[in-house]
């Protein structure tokens, strides 16, 4: 395997702040959300609802900033899906990773996510997020349904169903995400990158793309 | 501080033979009893010539009252308090005390002289009572302020006019009412005057309602935040705002969901003035943040559901009554058995009872429609007969979840007609009556006499059927700090565990989604653990 | 070696944590009563009076009353207090454990919970006694055995009347209750 590595700057300061703030909020919302769902008692229902709501508004605020940031910096392009090398990535996770085969994807500042990541994040953005945000929005504004004229079409049971379904998807995403964070060049390289912004990558290839 | 701990409640309330109308003095309004507080009334009845006479009877007093209050008699004679009869316009059922059967003392018709101690009139001793005669109206029972006016069961609505032994053969003497004094001291109704009947319904203190008993004459804040004698000190009429002697708020047609704004002076509003919303409006919770969510509960919950966490918080209320065991005698004599708290557990006259305090209500959907099982209506021999059925559903937009007291019992029914029977229980004062159950303890004669008085057939064979009577809980509103907490409903085995038709977060979940989602998450977790373990293993092998 | 020590340390920490978490369940006991609050109290009171070994009732507290007097609500709770000089005397006579007088008199709490059911709360006198040496351990062991008898209730027997101490009794509600104060 390559003996030399170099460091490249992948995640900018706002991006890192966004990631960790979002991570904290999502974990906290899962914790409070599943309590509201009745899975366990920790904060108590009333506090759990209160915290969950505050966290939701915080996350919305964070997203407003993040969306603004993505569009002004052009970083949104990082999520454009590609099927190129998807097969190679899957083969890598299924076999190559065990034999220390070289990572098929060369990370650069302009292409910081591997093709599977792109697909996964796009899935999060286009499927999980709408499910959880729309259902959550109606859940939160249950009292305004009549005013909005939607009380005839909605039932709390189904709103809660989709919100819970979204929550399970987030939970699954979260488990896989944490694990795959250890599947970089070294087990900690992705995590370090998310903390410091600097990712270790193999030398010659990254040098070439630079 | 010691005093707070000093006594354990000596639960002294004694069940009376049957509702015993007795008024106690209204709580003294101020700390200085020496000087009479300035009255806001424009009339001092002690100065009225009409009232300065030696009244010999109640009707004589009424005649004097009506001399000035010319329309009062007419007004009263149109009320349920007078007619004991009322037709439900919804389903045309004829209700009222004269007609309904309950599972307490069951029914009035054969027992007029006794039961009419709680009639706002004089002389109703049989079916021939003259409902047109306004001088038969009893003004004093509601307007007494002295506490010296008592109507005794057995006297057909009259108070004692001479000293008499009461209850008969008890050795206790009751002094006659000083009618002139009572008449000269009339005033607005009070918790004591309304309570003289309504606190003692069903045969004694705290028997019937559970949320109305004599502890409300002088309640602490804990018991009722509005009637708190040292605080807001509401009278009954503060909420049951009465006009022309017509009192709003009746459980025959409860206002299950008041969707009106708070009543405002000058604005025409014919809706029930006795609801919570009539003062508190539709968004009663002023809080911000998560507590603001409370206002969003008003589309499904009655206010009472959260704000009356338990009823009978000052003294126990009767929860069940089994007539089928009544009539047992010891050495040929009736007897009573007390429970550990000193309340009747058995009475030869009535059967077995169970009392309970701090009762957690049951909860039901109620849209205000109620149907009674009246005499002649079929009973459910193998199950439970509902004396009054509360209707409601989560989807009709008119229902709210209400706290109720469900009073359970067993009472006689006719094996032939399969409908309820009513025993003749009590006779007039001092009357020897062989068919009265409370004198002879014989069912056949009592049921025959009861059926005759009610104009019903009786086949001669009877059994006992299980019955349930439902009472909306609406009094004894606790301070807001003691309202239910969220978790008390939003949990798997909470207060509303048996209420169907709503999705209640924390209680409900789609089991398939939970199973599928849970398995998927677990699968993912196991998958990444296996994947990681394999990586570590392969790495070691290679390294 | 390091792993072994680490393992032992982890085991100790885990046991400690488990013990800490379960201490309340070990030190105190909660059982459901088939009867109402008053009847449960009454049956316990009569069991105490019939238990022998010098047991007398020393009071009946109702802390819910104080909450009510303050304008608030709590579900019914009553504390039956009992005392036996046979057991209190040896402990009170031993200077090193005299502080245990704070556990006197012996208390049994009867209360209703939000599920509408009635529960009986007791202290695990046997286990607690063991923490204070052989003298206390033996006495408390006997107390625990007697306490078990206090809670035996035969539904076939009729409900006895609750024994209510006279109002204004000495000791703030822990008045006579039919027995001597000890």
Roles of regions detected by a PLM:
Chain B
Residues 21-133, 140-190, 196-273, 277-295, ...:
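Sequence context of c-type cytochrome heme-c attachment sites
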Residues 42-47, 53, 59, 310-543:
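Long, charged, low-complexity terminal extensions
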Residues 299:
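Active-site-proximal binding-pocket segments
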Residues 1-4:
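Positively charged n-region of N-terminal signal peptides that target proteins for export
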Residues 302-305, 309-310:
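A conserved active-site cap/scaffold subdomain adjacent to cofactor or substrate pockets
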Residues 7-15:
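Bacterial N-terminal signal peptides
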